[in-house]
Structure formats: C-alpha cells, structure tokens
C-alpha cells in the first residue's frame, strides 16, 4: 500500500506528526507539508529529513492565507488524507478542502463552533473525518471510553457515578509562586483557564466556570491539584448524558498553581480581553521550558450489580522522545501520536462521514503503533 498525506501547519505538532509518520508507518507513505510560511516549511522539512534513513518524499507547499493556489490544488489532488495542525479557526476551511478533494481528514481543535461547522459539512462526505483527535480532546476521551467499556463488562452496570478525565502538560521542576512553566501555547493555557467547561452533573449536561471545582489527587504517589478547564471533554458529555451522574475534564497542575492564577485573574477586567490580559501577565512571570512531561489520568467510578462501589483508573506518564537525534517534547508526541493513529485508521478502513471521540474504537486505537509506542501501552 502506498499513500500520501498532506499536513496543514508546520509548527511543533505538524513537524512531530510528519516525523512520526515517516519513521514509524509500516507502509510506503509520502508527505506534503503545508504552511503560510516558507521559513516554517524549510525548518520542518529539515527536521523530518535530518538523520533519517527513510527514502519516501517530503514536499512543501506554501498555503495562501485566502483562496486556493494552483500548487495547493495539485497537492490536494494527489493526497489521500489531510491532517489539520493549523490554528483552530482554520478548521472548517481545511475540512472543506478535504471534502472537496476527496481526502480523509483529522484535526486537533477543541473549538466548539468550528467543530459544529465541520460536523454539518462532513455528514454526507465520501471519506472519514475524525475530529478532536489530539491529547485533550483526543487520547484522554478514548481512554475514558475504554475504561467505561471495561467497567460495564466487569461489573454489569452501564450507569456510573463519575467519569473523570485529567491531563497535565507539566515541567519536571516547578518554582514558587506560580509552580509552573510553559510547555505549550501560552494563549491556549490562558484561554482554558477562563472559558467555561462543559460537564455532566446529576446525569445532565451543564456548564461550570473554569477553575470552579478544584480537587487534590495523588497519582503515582505524587500529589497534584486538578480543576475544570475548557475544551477537553470532546463529545463525551453528549454520549454519557443519562449514563454518568458526573463527568468532567480537568487540567492537572502542581499544588499552589491555581491559587496563584486566581489571584492574577481577580485583578484583571472580567471581559472579552481576559484571555489576552492573563496571557500577558503570565508571560511576564512564568518561564517557557523545553524539558516537559505529560501526565494523563482517567477514572470510572460506580456500583457493580451487587451494589458495591468500584473504580477503574489508569494513568500514563510521558517524557520527551528522541528520534534520529531529534528531541520531541512530550506535548508534541502525546498530541501528534493520536492524530497519526487516526490517519492510519482512516487510510486502512472504510469509515465515511464524521467520527467523534466517543465513536473511536478504543481497542484498535490504544494498541495502534503510534499511540502504544508514545504512551507505552502494552
């Protein structure tokens, strides 16, 4: 089998996805990298090719901010799948290209409005569209689905008390007063701290303010704090309404961080400028750090068919990875691996239309080459 994938966006996640696909795919796979910046493209191509023994091609295409160039049209006509690593606001545009040119499509964005547009656009598509398939949303949701299916099989009850999904992109060390270091997009962090979170309470979907339900949790004998943030639940609230008394997505941090954030937010205007103002303030106080780690924890808690309380939980701790002498940060691999896994499943299968995170097969996804290698799943 020989296939070709177009990767839109050549930043940290795009170049990581390209490297993983080229080095780990077990069939012949050519790549085209697309970006609005030729400089980004040159850097990403050098990153993917450097030190590699693979001989498959890696082409580049500059993508105009508006419209469709002849070079892009030719590239799309030659590709089987489009992986969308562009900014979330571009997702409907990229999905439209995928549908128009008969490509499969997978993306990362948690943006609700953009996701709804793609669901409408792709409902009658002749190819598959896997949405929100990064780390969170993405891997964490499939992990939760896997644990829920295991709970039902083991304990004979399909109604549960709580489903918890938690992810932390952290640093190995953290210093007072903020106990944090940026390992990914600062504006992404600021936004998830102020946008509301979609949850289930008393079996019904509702919204809660970000950072309004803090808890302390011990994972692997270390203490963390977790609180509600936006975006990570994907479509699981819709799937579990009526099945779970409580469901939420929370971001993991070192103890003390959220108290510091609350102090900063309290001194800022509570209007549409809040994400940008919080980002600016945090950038002045918090360093950006290359040495990162990603912590993932999911749990399903409920009663078995004899009325005894049970819990199934799973945690993964992911550190940076080196391939061909190139260091990939944990946030890169944990985000890119699910995207790559989705691409391979689309290319090998016959799925059509929209595939949401609750509809991904946990068994094949979790034990696929990309996800299992990055997350060390046996």
Can you annotate each of these PLM segments?
Residues 65-77:
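Conserved Rossmann-fold cofactor-binding substructure of NAD(P)-dependent oxidoreductases
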Residues 76, 80-84, 105-107:
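N-terminal Rossmann-like NAD(P) cofactor-binding module of classical short-chain dehydrogenase/reductase
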Residues 108-129:
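Rossmann-fold NAD(P)-binding glycine/threonine-rich loop
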Residues 150-378:
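C-terminal catalytic/substrate-binding lobe primarily of soluble NAD(P)-dependent oxidoreductases
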